[in-house]
């Protein structure tokens, strides 16, 4: 395999990490006490030329876990009725098991070492995901325990915007505010944004890294 072909592998792009775009809608801000209401993930792949694309999607409405807190301000914001039977909600455990099975399979296929959360304001989603995994007592957690790719931070660097809708528009993507705060829609837009950020860096010549050239300018600053 040539050097360029090696650089075009997903496993070599992010230090063997398998990026999984995720958005979680919740009934509050406390990952340990407040209910997860909706979760969506999108896995990613790289084509033969090293361009990043969306791959598969999972989306679940979640039943509030026993004893969880439902904050009225949170559900007024995301407009989710946790107890509406038409949501077709499933248990948190079944949803998390399905997600982790998908991630483990992707890690294996892509030759990666572990999953890494990609999210907008990623600390929030990562905290809720880790709390849910612990709550349902799954020991083999494929995700990195603290590292994430935060598209809010990356967008602030690249286009000077940190709000998801503004970042998407600044980078040339459409955004429908009426669909915002749906886990499925926000995950889709975050995935589009992350792919464009990564691919734009490649188009500008930032990837693959020229280590020799970078070492020669290492004392510039």
Curated annotation (Swiss-Prot):
> What is this enzyme's EC?
3.1.13.-
Would you name any one GO CC term? cytosol
EC main class here is hydrolase
Q: Which GO terms describe its biological process?
A: DNA replication proofreading; tRNA processing
Could you name the active-site residues? 181 (proton donor/acceptor)
- Domain (Exonuclease): residue spans on this chain: 20-194
Q: Where is this site: Important for substrate binding and specificity?
A: 29, 77, 124, 146
Provide the binding site for Mg(2+) 2.
23, 25, 181, 186
Residues reported in the UniProt entry to bind Mg(2+) 1: 23
Instruction: Check the record and name the Pfam families matching this protein.
Output: RNase_T (PF00929)
Query: Is Metal-binding set as a keyword in this record?
Result: yes
Give the superkingdom in one word: Bacteria
Which proteins does it associate with, and in what oligomeric form? Homodimer.
Role played:
Trims short 3' overhangs of a variety of RNA species, leaving a one or two nucleotide 3' overhang. Responsible for the end-turnover of tRNA: specifically removes the terminal AMP residue from uncharged tRNA (tRNA-C-C-A). Also appears to be involved in tRNA biosynthesis.
State the family named in the UniProt similarity comment for this chain: Belongs to the RNase T family.
By what name is this protein known?
Ribonuclease T
Q: Which gene encodes it?
A: rnt
């Amino acid at each position: 395999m040539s050097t360029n072909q090696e650089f075009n592998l997903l496993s070599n792009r992010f230090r063997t990490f398998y990026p999984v775009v995720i958005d979680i809608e919740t009934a509050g801000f406390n990952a340990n006490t407040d209910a997860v209401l909706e979760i969506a993930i999108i896995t990613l792949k790289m084509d033969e030329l090293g361009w990043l694309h969306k791959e598969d999607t999972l989306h679940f409405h979640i039943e509030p876990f026993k004893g969880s807190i439902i904050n009225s301000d949170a559900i007024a914001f995301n407009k989710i009725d946790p107890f509406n039977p038409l949501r077709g909600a499933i248990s948190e455990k079944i949803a998390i098991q399905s997600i982790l099975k998908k991630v483990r399979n992707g890690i294996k296929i892509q030759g990666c070492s572990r999953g890494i959360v990609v999210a907008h304001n990623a600390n929030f989603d990562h905290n809720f995901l880790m709390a849910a995994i612990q709550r349902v007592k799954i020991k083999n957690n494929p995700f990195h325990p603290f590292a994430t790719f935060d598209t809010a931070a990356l967008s602030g660097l690249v286009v000077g915007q940190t709000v998801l809708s503004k970042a998407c528009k600044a980078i040339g993507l459409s955004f429908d505010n009426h669909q915002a705060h749906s886990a499925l829609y926000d995950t889709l837009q975050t995935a589009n944004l992350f792919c464009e950020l990564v691919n734009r860096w490649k188009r500008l010549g930032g990837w693959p890294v020229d280590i020799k050239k970078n070492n020669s300018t290492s004392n510039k600053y």
